[in-house]
């Protein structure tokens, strides 16, 4: 019993020691490009509640923009922000330029939350 407890405590201790190593990269250390190719530092959003979304304008989930906008409007005065990152890597479902995507979202769903330049989200081997 005591031997098992020591082993368990050792595992927990090692896991806790690894947390700072795993947490060194946080969202505030990243910079991204907006639709005008300007660099935006995510540390500018520090203190806000962020919902970072990967979106597409030509897929079955495109109507999510309506719900995202409603969430944003409801909670933005309490520090909530939706950060929208379109991606064309999944079946080419986010075609067009940033301007095309932005115009589509604003005219069809009235989006006002920050929308960034298209990103690639797949890893090297995906």
Model-identified regions with their sequence ranges:
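Bacterial Sec-dependent N-terminal signal peptides
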Residues: 1-25
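Generic structural marker for isolated residues within well-ordered, non-membrane alpha-helices
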Residues: 10, 28-29, 102
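Short, flexible, glycine/charge-rich loop motifs used to bind or transfer phosphoryl groups or to couple energy/partner
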Residues: 16-20, 39-42, 71-73
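N-terminal "domain-start" segment that seeds a small globular fold
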Residues: 22-43, 126
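Amphipathic alpha-helical repeat scaffolds
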Residues: 34, 54-58
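Local sequence-structure signature of Cys/Sec-based thiol-disulfide redox active-site neighborhoods
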Residues: 46-51
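Structural microenvironment flanking redox-active thiols in thiol-disulfide oxidoreductases
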Residues: 61-125
